[in-house]
């Protein structure tokens, strides 16, 4: 603003002392710019109203997020340009190294318009809990003598669940009496013992439908059987820090696998519990209702690899709460000798163990020896090398057993 006044007096003094057509022509040519600059300096940015619309407040990882910012005002003052910058959460780019800097900034010619819409898309949202906090607008004169900005506090939350890749060929281990038998059978029910009815859940078999109740209620109703086999599945996620997982890709794979196996087990009628082992362990009790999936997904959306102690210590206090018919699905990025001792104790209690180990290109030699010990104990082991979860369960894949 000070430079504008100095230039104005300089042009006026030049015209007064020099005189002539040229000097006064320069002064009058510069006068509209001076007046506009002065007007811009007094234009209140409080006249501008800002709103942000996000197409989805909850979505799955790798899905796009569309953001629309609308600018409106009351006074028809000519603004040569308007810069809009949405301050997106910094951890969006940090969590996804393949995601370039989000294009959440735009420059527009506003003129006499009363409304303006700015739209941008974030492709491939990474898993996490994000907070969009503020939007900044900037404007000024054509030469940059006057620049004004205002930040609008518009807080909105976006929750990105882990990506679910349905492992269609996976079914939890079947337990016969004594908890020792393991097979690849699908879930089975005692079809002669019907305890109640419930709403249809995707994945229910056609033979389970109660057609009379369906006709009476005008919605699909499924029979609830009293003695399900393979009912209890305890999904365990190990959040221990793995120094070899520098970019966190293995942990993301493990989180996605935990979500995928939970979804698959619930769809096939199992009761699912969940344990997340870290600095503060999280326990979710057994349930077979559809809302159980969302309880677990809410935790998985924001979980981080931040555990430092061996997971066997935290897991031990929950062992007594599991029935002998429980199958433990243990998901981790590394194994230790203490974990082998833990699994041996679980097997002696009659529990079945199915372990998913997210690895890099190869298994370290130290862990390979531990894997051989686990296999000899009867632990089912899946080596998860990539995101093709169904591939690890095909015949001849990475499933190992004694």
Q: Where does each model-flagged region fall?
A:
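Residues that form generic nucleotide/phosphate-binding pockets
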Residues: 87, 200, 299, 303, ...
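Short, charged loop segments at secondary-structure junctions
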Residues: 282-313
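An amphipathic, basic-hydrophobic helix/alpha-beta surface used to engage anionic
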Residues: 24, 32-285, 327-331, 345, ...
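Generic recognition of stable, solvent-exposed alpha-helical segments in well-folded globular domains
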Residues: 253-256, 295, 369
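Von Willebrand factor type A / integrin I
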Residues: 1-43, 306-402
């Amino acid at each position: 603003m000070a430079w504008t006044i100095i230039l104005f007096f300089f042009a006026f003094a030049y015209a007064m002392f020099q005189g002539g057509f040229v000097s006064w022509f320069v002064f009058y040519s510069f006068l509209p710019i001076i007046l506009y600059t002065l007007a811009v300096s007094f234009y209140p940015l409080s006249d501008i109203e800002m709103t942000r619309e996000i197409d989805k407040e909850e979505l799955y990882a790798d899905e796009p997020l569309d953001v629309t910012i609308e600018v409106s005002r009351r006074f028809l003052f000519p603004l040569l340009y308007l810069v809009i910058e949405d301050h997106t959460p910094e951890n969006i780019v940090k969590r996804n190294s393949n995601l370039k800097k989000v294009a959440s900034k735009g420059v527009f010619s506003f003129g006499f318009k009363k409304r303006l819409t700015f739209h941008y898309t974030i492709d491939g949202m990474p898993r996490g809990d994000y907070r969009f906090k503020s939007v900044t607008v900037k404007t000024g004169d054509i030469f940059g003598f006057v620049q004004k900005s205002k930040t609008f506090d518009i807080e909105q939350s976006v929750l990105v669940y882990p990506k679910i890749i349905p492992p269609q060929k996976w079914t939890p281990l079947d337990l016969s009496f004594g908890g020792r038998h393991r097979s690849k059978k699908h879930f089975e029910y005692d079809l002669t013992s019907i305890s109640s009815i419930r709403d249809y859940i995707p994945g229910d078999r056609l033979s389970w439908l109660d057609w009379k109740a369906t006709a009476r209620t005008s919605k699909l109703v499924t029979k609830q059987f009293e003695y399900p086999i393979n009912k209890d599945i305890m999904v365990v996620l190990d959040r221990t820090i793995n120094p070899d997982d520098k970019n966190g890709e293995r942990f993301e794979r493990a989180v996605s696998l935990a979500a995928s196996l939970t979804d698959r087990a619930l769809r096939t009628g199992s009761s699912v519990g969940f344990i997340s082992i870290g600095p503060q362990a999280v326990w979710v009790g057994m349930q077979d209702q559809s809302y159980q999936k969302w309880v677990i997904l809410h935790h998985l959306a924001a979980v981080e690899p931040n555990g430092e102690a061996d997971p066997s210590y935290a897991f031990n206090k929950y062992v007594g709460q599991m029935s002998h018919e429980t199958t433990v699905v243990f998901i981790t990025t590394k194994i230790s000798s203490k974990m082998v001792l833990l699994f041996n104790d679980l097997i002696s209690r009659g529990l079945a163990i199915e372990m998913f180990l997210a690895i890099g290109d190869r298994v370290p030699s130290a862990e390979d020896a531990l894997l051989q010990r686990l296999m000899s104990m009867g632990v089912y082991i899946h080596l998860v090398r990539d995101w093709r979860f169904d591939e690890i369960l095909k015949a001849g894949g990475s499933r190992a057993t004694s």
